[in-house]
A protein has these predicted regions:
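Extracellular/oxidizing-compartment recognition motifs
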Residues: 1-279, 287-288, 304-309
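Well-ordered alpha-helical scaffold segments within catalytic/enzyme domains
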Residues: 223, 291-302
Length: 310
């Protein structure tokens, strides 16, 4: 079991401080297999190590004295189906001191997930690129289709203004059908949709936290009027690493094939090299990597990710 290390020196304040953590379902929600959908509930272990100038060390570890709640804005979430977010349930200051957590529950000490704790050497996933949409059409009354102009992996960041309780739904797809609606049959049982409920306080900005999608097109519903292209940005998410290689030739077809490979490879770096970023699979199959790993190494500095996975 890998753990992350962070230097939080610059975030410490004089006086009292607070530690706040948000847990998503992650890989506890499984690939679609008969009879197995959830392996466990989200859990975490954490400790803050404080080193004083006089050499003293203090460790503050997670235990049953910590407080928890499931009443925050993030609802249903997993990487296959998307995320539901109700902005009306936001708790300003929940991860700062002071904050009234008297209605929160006490944390429970639970069993370890198994395995041995060891430091993760590779860097985490982050926003590595952005994509501006190129078009928006109305495929049916109140149904808008956003075209990112590029098949990408990540999520959609949006700016929106409306009334409290307005419910916006975003459905993601790689292709369109002949009638202009999104094609989702290739996703199989993955819903690949995000839901955002407005709090109604002027302009709101949002992107999900615990999901990602493989898509070019986004179906938008629940909007009071046709949204603007400037309201959206595609954020490309994959494991942070350097791009170390490139290929450019005099043949546009070869260049396009290379770019397709480039986008496809980095879109499948999700804490491990996966087989696909859109349907109900997204697994780290050995066969896929046996074929592609050598070629990938000429483009990306990916050795730490592969070391973690293997």
């Amino acid at each position: 079991v890998k753990y992350n290390r962070f230097d939080v020196t610059g975030q410490l304040l004089k006086g009292a401080n607070a530690i706040g953590v948000i847990l998503g379902n992650g890989r506890y929600t499984s690939m679609r297999m008969p009879g197995v959908r959830h392996f466990d509930v989200p859990k975490m272990i954490a400790q803050l190590e404080v080193y004083y100038e006089d050499g003293e060390k203090r460790v503050i570890a997670s235990d049953a004295s910590w407080k928890i709640t499931a009443e925050g804005p993030i609802g249903t979430n997993n990487e296959f189906d998307g995320e539901e977010y109700d902005a009306r349930k936001e708790m300003p200051g929940w991860n700062t001191y002071p904050f009234d957590d008297t209605k929160w529950l006490q944390a429970e000490v639970v069993s370890l997930p198994g395995g041995k704790l060891e430091a993760q050497l590779n860097r985490n996933m982050k926003v590595m690129d952005t994509v501006k949409p190129i078009g928006i059409t109305e495929s049916a009354p109140g149904v808008y289709i956003l075209d990112m102009g590029q098949n990408m992996v990540g999520w959609l960041r949006m700016k929106v203004k409306g009334q409290s309780g307005d419910t916006l739904k975003l459905r993601f797809a790689e292709l369109l059908q002949k009638d202009g609606s999104i094609y989702t049959a290739n996703l199989r049982t993955a819903h690949s949709a995000d839901t955002y409920i407005l709090k109604g306080n002027s302009m709101e900005e949002w992107q999900p936290t615990f999901t990602y999608h493989g898509f070019r097109f986004v179906e938008l519903t629940g909007f009071r009027e046709k949204p603007s292209l400037s309201d959206f940005e595609g954020q490309v998410i994959y494991d942070e690493m350097e791009t170390t290689g490139n290929l450019e030739t005099s043949d546009p077809m070869i260049n396009r094939i290379y770019k397709n490979a480039y986008w496809g490879i980095r879109g499948n770096y999700r804490g491990m090299p996966t087989d696909c970023p859109q349907r109900d699979e997204r697994m780290g199959w050995l066969g896929d990597r046996a074929v592609g790993s050598q070629g990938e190494s000429y483009i990306f500095n990916n050795h730490l990710l592969y070391a973690k996975w293997l």
